[in-house]
């Protein structure tokens, strides 16, 4: 986009409670960028990004590992490709089209310099100093909820005689390893899980959370290989309302979790069958040994291109490592599992975007500062990449003296941004991309077309057409009455 970029990264000098490396684009949670099934909302968002030339999505595509209908990446390869791309631009000097890397923590933002456009994309683990600086600028407290990391197991330690490869309902390729449970095995596992010792909450984690942040349910976030429609079949409240499915224990944790990615032990406490109607749902996963669906299933998803490690889908948790080792080895096929990473919880920080941001992701009070990624209130890797892509385009327009044009409401990108900037501020909560965020079809068309898939196809066609026009017109937006900027500063601790 013809800008000189100064990229700030605080690692390795200051790390976070979740990151393990100093690498760019380190994926600390899932390795999935969600569904690639045509005419789904995640697919639409990625299609728009591909048409806009998203480098991060290009690197994700080239780092892909088998994951059925999802785009999952080898996180090490993905990070290395992003780093190589940045290094190539950082090694050609200074001036338009170059990047200068600064390995230092950002402690202050200069909102008064008209010649500097800043993109703040510090993510869910924004450092305390930068969070305090952002609070100084906005005058509003930040919100917080807790995000989770799933365990990873060494593939060579899986007992393949007890598990099987399968895709749900045999759709697509059989990329997932399925660990089947009998009722007795499930009951034993559930009892151990709900009584396992959790990690005590640290003082820095106990930040007041908006009640609204506790009410959103996005099941596909913890089942990213499934479409939004399939994820709705996994609603936790879909379990039978029987006395056997009453909550097992009182929640001992003082933390407030994002409902779309609950720790597995928190889900289990909601009833004995809740896991079987959620992340351990066996429907459509026929066991070749019995010819039937198991009582419950744990799915393992390939973690890297070498296929030497797998993550436990939906098994993010907040248990002590010793407890995890004991409980997870009750999963059939994982009795002798070697865990390369255990599950963890980390705090996720985001701003009250409806109060603070314009539709071009600029702070209302300080328009030379843009907020992108999860800090802006979008939820998920794909949504964060999309948000950063838009912020970069808007910032480049400002730097070249043009008025940035917001992405059209008809598009997935535009609808996601419209949501975070127009939601009810008192009840604002992070959002994944879903068709609920896009404008609905006209009433007469909805009456005429009853099939939901066909409706979604029309929404996707309209979105891509509007996106193509926007890409063309945004290059021709009128100039703004402000000095041209020669520096774009992106701050990513």
Give residue ranges: language-model regions:
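N-terminal phosphate/diphosphate-binding loop that engages ATP/GTP or pyrophosphate donors
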Residues: 15-39
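A conserved beta-strand/loop capping segment in the N-terminal third of enzymes
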Residues: 19-20, 36-83
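Predominantly flavin-linked oxidoreductase catalytic cores and closely associated redox partners
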Residues: 89-93, 97-219, 251-301, 306, ...
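A glycine-rich dinucleotide-binding beta-alpha-beta segment and adjacent secondary-structure elements
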Residues: 312-378, 385-387, 405-423, 428-434, ...
């Amino acid at each position: 986009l013809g800008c000189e970029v100064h990229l700030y990264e605080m690692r390795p000098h200051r790390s976070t409670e979740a990151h393990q490396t100093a690498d760019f684009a380190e994926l600390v949670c899932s390795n999935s960028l969600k569904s690639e099934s045509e005419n789904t909302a995640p697919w639409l968002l990625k299609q728009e990004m591909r048409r806009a030339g998203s480098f991060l999505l290009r690197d994700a595509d080239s780092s892909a590992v088998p994951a059925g209908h999802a785009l999952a990446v080898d996180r090490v390869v993905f990070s290395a490709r992003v780093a190589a791309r940045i290094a190539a631009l950082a090694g050609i000097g200074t001036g338009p089209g170059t990047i200068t890397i600064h390995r230092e923590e950002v402690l202050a933002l200069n909102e008064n310099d008209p010649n500097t456009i800043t993109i703040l994309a510090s993510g869910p683990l924004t450092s305390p100093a930068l969070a305090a600086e952002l609070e100084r600028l906005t005058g509003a407290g930040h919100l917080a909820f807790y995000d989770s990391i799933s365990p990873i197991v060494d593939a060579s330690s899986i007992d393949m005689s007890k598990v099987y490869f399968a895709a749900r309902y045999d759709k697509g390729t059989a990329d997932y390893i399925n660990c089947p449970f009998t009722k007795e095995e499930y009951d034993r596992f559930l009892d151990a899980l709900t009584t396992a010792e959790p990690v005590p909450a640290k003082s820095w984690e106990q930040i007041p959370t908006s009640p609204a942040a506790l009410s959103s349910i996005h099941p596909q976030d913890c089942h990213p290989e499934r479409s939004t429609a399939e994820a709705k079949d996994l609603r936790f409240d879909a379990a039978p309302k029987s006395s056997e499915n009453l909550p097992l224990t009182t929640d001992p944790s003082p933390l407030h979790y994002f409902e779309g990615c609950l720790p597995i032990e928190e889900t289990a406490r909601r009833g004995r069958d809740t896991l079987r109607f959620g992340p351990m749902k066996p429907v459509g996963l026929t066991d070749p040994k019995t010819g039937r669906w198991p009582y419950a299933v744990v799915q393992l998803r390939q973690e890297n291109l070498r296929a030497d490690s797998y993550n436990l889908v939906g098994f993010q948790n907040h248990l002590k490592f010793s407890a995890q080792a004991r409980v997870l080895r009750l999963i059939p096929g994982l009795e002798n599992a070697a865990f390369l990473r255990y599950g963890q919880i980390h705090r996720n920080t985001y701003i009250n975007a409806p109060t603070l941001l314009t539709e071009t992701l600029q702070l209302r009070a300080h328009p030379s500062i843009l907020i992108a990624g999860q800090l802006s209130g979008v939820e998920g890797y794909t949504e964060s990449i999309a948000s950063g892509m838009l912020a970069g385009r808007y910032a480049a327009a400002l730097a070249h003296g043009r008025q940035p044009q917001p992405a059209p409401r008809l598009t997935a990108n535009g609808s996601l941004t419209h949501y975070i900037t127009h939601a009810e501020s008192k009840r604002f909560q992070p959002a994944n991309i879903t068709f609920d965020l896009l404008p609905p079809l006209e009433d007469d068309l909805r009456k005429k077309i009853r099939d939901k898939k066909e409706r979604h196809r029309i929404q996707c066609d309209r979105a891509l057409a509007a996106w193509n026009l926007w890409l063309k017109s945004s290059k021709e937006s009128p100039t703004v009455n402000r000095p041209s900027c020669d520096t774009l500063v992106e701050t990513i601790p």
